[in-house]
Amino acid sequence: EEFAPGFKCNLINDVIKWIDPRVIKKLNLGLHGLNIYSPELVRIALDRKNKHISFYRDPNKTAASIAKQSEKDAKVWPDFNKYIDAQSQFLASLYEITPPNLPHVGLKDLWTMRSMLKPLRKNGTSGLVDFIRVAAMMMPELMDEWFESKLVRGAVSAAGIALINQGPFSAATGLNLLHQQVHCSSVFHNIHFVKGGMGKLAETLALTAQSAGTVIRTKAKVDS
């Protein structure tokens, strides 16, 4: 939206965390004008003493920035990224599953759940146990296992409460953190921008639907 003559910005939501690659491919969103780009610098955590932490797509560059706050935290940062990415793979596979017809679950329904085997083979049963454990955690519990710097802990915990009406001490904010990291390839706080603004995403989806024969009606009366 134009908030001043010649100046436009996204007024509500300004970035995309992730879109399922299958959706982009199946709907041919790129052919209908969707242009997504990913910045190198994804987040900045400000510090009163000017020891700001910059989060980059490259975890090693992020670690170098974290070192201004804590050498210990900087050292474990790459391992933390890999750990969270491994847990988020279970969610990514879960999101690929068509929900079974409960309570009548047959062999066909079980076959659709085969995508869950991929992260299980890659990370083992210990990885599945870690996923269940992290998903149930609140942010301070997870932070206690990894970081000492308050700024690092706060910046990472922000991902656990993003887009939900809960605080970091709420149970299962670990699940939300993992959800935010799906399809992020070990890039913590990963974000994408839509060229032309977030409204362009809605326009692209509309064009895609119309190209498939959908008629979009607005200001139409709906009977409940």
Regions from the language model: what does each represent?
Residues 6, 14, 24-26, 35, ...:
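Homeobox/homeodomain signature
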Residues 38, 218-220:
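Short loop/edge segments at beta-strand edges and connector loops
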Residues 85-212, 219:
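Active-site/ligand-binding neighborhood in enzyme catalytic cores
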Residues 1-103:
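N-terminal glycine-rich phosphate/pyrophosphate-binding loop and immediately adjacent elements
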